Amino acid sequence: MKFDQLLKERYSVRKFSNQKVEKEKIDKILEAARIAPTAVNYQPQRILVVEDPDNLAKLKECTKYHFHAPLAMILCYDKTVSWKDMHNRECGEVDVSIVATYMMLKLFDLGLGSTYVGSFDYKELIKQFNIPENYVPVMILPIGYPREDCVPGPMHDKRKPISAIVSYEEYTQGE
C-alpha cells in the first residue's frame, strides 16, 4: 500500500474477529515499535504483549475499551530511561505516542486493525500485569483482524481544513 493511501484509509477498529494474529505479524509490529524515533534515541518504550485468554480477561478488569480483541499490547515507558528536557519535562509519553503511531500504521498495512485506548484504570493495570514501578503505562492497543461488519466511523473523513489547524510564524488573536 502506498504511504498516502495508508494514512487516509487507516481507521480506528473497535470490532474484531476471533482470528488469532500470527506470530510473524506480531513480530513485524514490534519491529515497527523498535525502529520508531524517540527523544535522543533513548528508546524508553516498553511493550507488554497480551494474547493469553486469561490475561485478556484481566485486561477487561482494567478498561471497558478492550473491544474483545484477540491481542492487546500495553505500551509503557521506563522513566529511568526516558529523556527529560532542560525544564525537566518527561518525554516518555510523547515517545510512546510516536511508537504507537508507527505500530498502528504497520498493523493496518498488514491487514490488521487497532485503536488507541487511553482510558483505563491505571492502578489496576499495574497490579494485574505486575508492571514495574519505574514503568509508566500510557496506552493499550487492542489488535486483531477487523470483523466483516467493521467500517470507519462517521467522523473518519471529517477533517478540518489546513487553515484551521496551521498558522505561520506566530499566532494571531482569536486563533
Show the residue positions of the predicted features.
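Acidic, surface-exposed loops and disordered segments
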Residues: M1-E175
